[in-house]
Every structure is written in C-alpha cells, then in structure tokens.
Amino acid sequence: MQLSSTQPSSKTQEPSTAQDVITMQHILEKLYGANSISRQESQALFGAIIRGELEASQLAAALISMKVRGEHPDEIAGAATALLADAQPFPRPDYLFADIVGTGGDGTNSINISTASAFVAASCGLKIAKHGNRSVSSRSGSSDLLSAFGIKLDMSAQDSRQALDDLGVCFLFAPQYHLGFRHAMPVRQQLKTRTVFNVLGPLVNPARPPLALIGVYSPELVRPIAETLKVLGYQRAAVVHGGGMDEVAIHAPTQVAELNHGEIETYELTHRDFGLDTHPLSALQGGTPEENRDILASLLQGKGERAHAAAVAANVALLLRLFGQEDLRQNAQQALEVIHSGQAYQRVIALSARG
C-alpha cells in the first residue's frame, strides 16, 4: 500500500472552548477524585498550564493525581494537542517523513542510539525530522550531542526544513518550539519524579510527522503510547521498550506496539529477527557529550564498535519497516552497509556546516 503523508490531527477545539462548558476547578476536582478526564478536558487543562494560568500547588496536585492513577491515552493525547496548538510553526513537508525519538529517563546512560540512527536512516534515503532536548537521565541527550558536533540548536524553522529537504535530516530543539513548557518546569523540578510531561516530548514534534519510532522508558507505556498515537492521527508508528532501554534492544527482547492505519499489533523482537549478534548492555555505555561525539563519529565513519553498529542497525531496520520496507533482516543489512560506508558521517558534517 502506498503511504501518504497525512498530517496527524492537531487542529481541534481551542482549550477555551472546553472551559466555556466545564470550569478548570471541575477538571481539577475530577483528577483529585482519581477520575479520568476527557481528551477535551485534558487539552483545556494543559492549555492553561502552558499559558501559566495554574498555581504551582494546582499543577503539582494535577500531575501527581494523574501519575498515581495512571495516565489514559485520551488524556495524553489531549495534552499533546494543547502543546502542538501552542507550538511555534514549522513548514511541514508534503512528502513522507518520520521522527525517531525516545522519552529518555531509562537510566541506562547509553550512547545516543536514536540520534545516530537518524543520520543512518537519512543515508538510507529516508526523511527524518528529529525532535529532541537536553538530557533527561543520561549524561548526554540528543541536543547535548548535536552541540558537541557543532550543529546549531537554534536553527530557524525554514533552515531546518531546508536541511530536511537537502540532507534528509533535521533536528528540532524542543525549547525553541514549545515556549510554554517553562511554566511547568519549576514544579517538575520540585516533584523530582516522572510525570506525563516525560512522555509528551516524543508526541509533540512541531513538524507533525505521519510516521514515528518512539522508545519509552517502561514496558507498561508501550501499548498506551501506541493508543495515544492512534488518537493523534499518526499513520504508522512503532512504540518500543527493550530490556530497560527506550530503544530497540540487541541485548534483550524488545516489546513493540505497532500502529498501522488505525490498527495496533503488539509483538516481540530479538536480535535474531534482525540477523544480528547479541551484545551486552554494558557494550553500549555512553559518556559525556564529547565522549559520545567521538564514539558516534567513529561509528558513522565505519570505524566503530560492532555492538554500536548493531544497535543502530536494529533501530534503523524497524524505522525502515514503517516506510514500507517490511523485511527486518534486509533492512538491518542495508543500515550496516551505510554505516560501514561512512555516508552517514558526511551528513553530520554537512548539517554542522549550516550555521
């Protein structure tokens, strides 16, 4: 089936519409009573949050209430819709493109697999608009690594779109597009625990990709986030958790929930499904942004560790499947050939030259 670049839905009722019918206090009272709220109510709540309209105590209570009960896909989708409605604009292309991103917070301090995978995927002919931020749990998040490579984080939306057109890859720095996040940051820092904001990052790419490979920090999130992507209108996506990592893993089985035109299938993948050798998690240990830069520079020039190449190849292979290349073994081999050729590193150099 030919894939189209149908835009995930983000144009729904404005948050104020919900507030005309149901007061913010009523929404908060529902949360305090351990009740779920509708997508419209969640959109209204998070619209108020990113406009700075909630007191710190109200915000903290709402976030903890949702966390203790467990966030529902409609609630997460409503929050994402509010953030996307408030995001700075990005000139969305009409061709097929994807994001590859993780929630972070898995605590493994691994190398930047999804960032390396974005460059390899672009060298395989895909278009990747990667949404990223500073580190959540490791010593080096995607944006930390890009800075170490000399890639501009504050590239304009138009220049980023041009890079996507020309190089097949661009990076969108979350704080540049989501200004309202700042209103929640003090409370999030005080709470010192994961909240719904930890899973929102991968769902609010301002380019609104129709395809996505999203890693989550807990296996319990795999199915709910896939359900959320369905609500948001994604065309095809895979949500993964592998052996404690927010990535496709080669050291342990990977749990997958794949969304394909409104249908969700759950399954498990191992290194054998990709025709790859297994490697221990310790072989993927990362370091500072500068150390990770050196590791990935070596990898993307075809001179890296076998474990690093295999980890990236597995993730690129599943990403290729989302574009319609269904054979994971062939996809992994294609990714390895690109890695060994050094083509991916040329894209790093080209992107860093776009000052």
From Swiss-Prot:
Positions of anthranilate 2 binding: R188
Cofactors that this protein relies on: Mg(2+)
Q: Name one Pfam family in it.
A: Glycos_transf_3
Alphabetically ordered keywords of this record: Amino-acid biosynthesis, Aromatic amino acid biosynthesis, Glycosyltransferase, Magnesium, Metal-binding, Transferase, Tryptophan biosynthesis
Q: Could you confirm whether the keyword Chloroplast appears in this record?
A: no
Q: Name one GO cellular component term.
A: cytosol
Q: Quick one: which pathway?
A: Amino-acid biosynthesis; L-tryptophan biosynthesis; L-tryptophan from chorismate: step 2/5
Its recorded reaction(s) are:
N-(5-phospho-beta-D-ribosyl)anthranilate + diphosphate = 5-phospho-alpha-D-ribose 1-diphosphate + anthranilate
Annotated positions binding anthranilate 1: G102, N133
The cofactor note reads: Binds 2 magnesium ions per monomer.
Enzyme Commission (EC) number:
2.4.2.18
Concerning SUPFAM superfamilies, the annotation shows:
Nucleoside phosphorylase/phosphoribosyltransferase catalytic domain (SSF52418), Nucleoside phosphorylase/phosphoribosyltransferase N-terminal domain (SSF47648)
Instruction: Give the record's GO biological process terms.
Output: L-tryptophan biosynthetic process
Binding positions for 5-phospho-alpha-D-ribose 1-diphosphate per the UniProt entry: 102, 105-106, 110, 112-115, 130-138, 142
> What positions does the entry give for Mg(2+) 1 binding?
S114, E247
**GO MF annotations in UniProt:** anthranilate phosphoribosyltransferase activity; magnesium ion binding
Q: Which residues bind Mg(2+) 2?
A: D246, E247
InterPro entries named among the record's database cross-references: Anthranilate_Pribosyl_Tfrase (IPR005940), Glycosyl_Trfase_fam3 (IPR000312), Glycosyl_Trfase_fam3_N_dom (IPR017459), Glycosyl_Trfase_fam3_N_dom_sf (IPR036320), Nuc_phospho_transferase (IPR035902)
**What does the UniProt record say this protein does?**
Catalyzes the transfer of the phosphoribosyl group of 5-phosphorylribose-1-pyrophosphate (PRPP) to anthranilate to yield N-(5'-phosphoribosyl)-anthranilate (PRA).
| Subunit organization | Homodimer.
Query: Cross-referenced PANTHER family, in alphabetical order?
Result: ANTHRANILATE PHOSPHORIBOSYLTRANSFERASE (PTHR43285:SF2)
Under HAMAP family, the record lists: TrpD
Family from the record? Belongs to the anthranilate phosphoribosyltransferase family.
Tell me what this protein is called: Anthranilate phosphoribosyltransferase
From what organism does this protein derive?
Pectobacterium atrosepticum (strain SCRI 1043 / ATCC BAA-672) (Erwinia carotovora subsp. atroseptica)
Q: Which gene encodes it?
A: trpD
